[in-house]
Each structure stands twice: as structure tokens, then as C-alpha cells.
Amino acid sequence: MARFPNPAERPYKLPDLCTALDTTLHDITIDCVYCKTQLQQTEVYEFAFSDLFIVYRNGEPYAACQKCIKFHAKVRELRHYSNSVYATTLESITNTKLYNLSIRCMSCLKPLCPAEKLRHVNTKRRFHQIAGSYTGQCRHCWTSNREDRRRIRRETQV
């Protein structure tokens, strides 16, 4: 992996790093900043799709694998949870329409699309303020959490 000693010249998004290295998302190899393992191809795409920033250690670029993202998102939630509000309350607090707010998934940190925000409104789910930012749940984490709860309920039924 190429080194970027000058902070002004560092790309901070994965597609920009690919351009700087003259490679593609399919061919790039990058390590996790937390566990130091090389990201798998699916994790590279998920990192790019999540619109997360690349971090640099000693001029070397690092991303984060999905396991570490989920772990550190949970730690962030447990340490920095502030409050939970419904969408209408969130709009009145911020004086901004829900569509224009930048809200990420509390589990995988992916930005929520308008359909995922609308799902929170329709099902009367709350958004959570964690570390100063509002979060919800993306479609993938919503369904996987629901399946986990169902499995636990089935296992505990007598």
C-alpha cells in the first residue's frame, strides 16, 4: 500500500484512494485499523457504500472491517447514548425535514436512505442521539435484529 506522508494530499474516501492509487474497488487491498486484518472484498464494498472516512497511521491508509465497525458502534452507543425521539420531534428540534437530515445506522454506520427513514416514521420507531448525532436502523440491520429476536423467542418457548 502506498504511503501518503503529506496530510493535504491524502484521499479520505475509498473511491478517491482508488483513483490516487490507479486501482479499482475490486482490486484494492486495505487493512482494518482496529484488528489489522485485510478487508475481504465484500467489506471493501460495504465500507465504500457506508461512506466512511479512511484513517491514516504513519502515512498508511486504513479502513474498518464489518466486525470491528459493529463492535465499535455498539461501544459508542453504550458510552454516548443521550436520548431517543420520534421523527416529528426530531424535525422540530433540528428545524430540518427528516429527508434532509444526515442519519446513520446505529449498528453498521451506513447512511439511512429516505425509505429507511420513512420506515421509522410508519412503524413509530425512535431515532437515537448517540455522540451528538442521530441514528436509526438500516433495512439490513432492522431485519437481522428482528430475526435474532424471533430465534431467541422460539428457543425460550416451553
UniProtKB/Swiss-Prot annotation:
Where in the cell is the protein located? Answer: Host cytoplasm; Host nucleus
GO function terms (MF aspect): DNA binding; PDZ domain binding; zinc ion binding
User: For this chain's UniProt record, which GO biological process terms are given?
Assistant: DNA-templated transcription; regulation of DNA-templated transcription; symbiont-mediated perturbation of host apoptosis; symbiont-mediated perturbation of host ubiquitin-like protein modification; symbiont-mediated suppression of host cytoplasmic pattern recognition receptor signaling pathway via inhibition of IRF3 activity; symbiont-mediated suppression of host type I interferon-mediated signaling pathway
Signal sequence interval, chain numbering: none
What's a GO cellular component annotated to this UniProt protein?
host cell nucleus
Where is this chain primarily localised? host cell
- Which InterPro entries is this protein grouped with? E6, E6_sf
Pfam families in the record: E6 (PF00518)
Q: Which domain of life is it from?
A: Viruses
Q: Mark the unnamed zinc finger spans by residue number.
A: 32-68, 105-141
Going by the UniProt record, its keywords in alphabetical order are: Activator, DNA-binding, Early protein, Host cytoplasm, Host nucleus, Host-virus interaction, Inhibition of host innate immune response by virus, Inhibition of host IRF3 by virus, Inhibition of host RLR pathway by virus, Metal-binding, Modulation of host cell apoptosis by virus, Oncogene, Transcription, Transcription regulation, Viral immunoevasion, Zinc, Zinc-finger
Which ranges form a coiled coil?
none
Motif PDZ-binding domain positions after renumbering to this chain: 156-158
Relate the protein's function as given in its record. Answer: Plays a major role in the induction and maintenance of cellular transformation. Acts mainly as an oncoprotein by stimulating the destruction of many host cell key regulatory proteins. E6 associates with host UBE3A/E6-AP ubiquitin-protein ligase, and inactivates tumor suppressors TP53 and TP73 by targeting them to the 26S proteasome for degradation. In turn, DNA damage and chromosomal instabilities increase and lead to cell proliferation and cancer development.
Binding partners and assembly: Forms homodimers. Interacts with ubiquitin-protein ligase UBE3A/E6-AP and thus forms a complex with human TP53. Interacts with human NFX1 and MAGI3. Interacts with human IRF3; this interaction inhibits the establishment of antiviral state. Interacts with human TYK2; this interaction inhibits JAK-STAT activation by interferon alpha. Interacts with host DLG1; this interaction leads to the proteasomal degradation of DLG1.
The UniProt entry's sequence similarity note says: Belongs to the papillomaviridae E6 protein family.
Q: What else is known?
A: Belongs to the high risk human alphapapillomavirus family. The cancer-causing human papillomavirus E6 protein has a unique carboxy terminal PDZ domain containing substrate.
Specify the protein name.
Protein E6
Protein's organism = Human papillomavirus type 70
Which gene is annotated as encoding this protein in its UniProt record?
A: E6
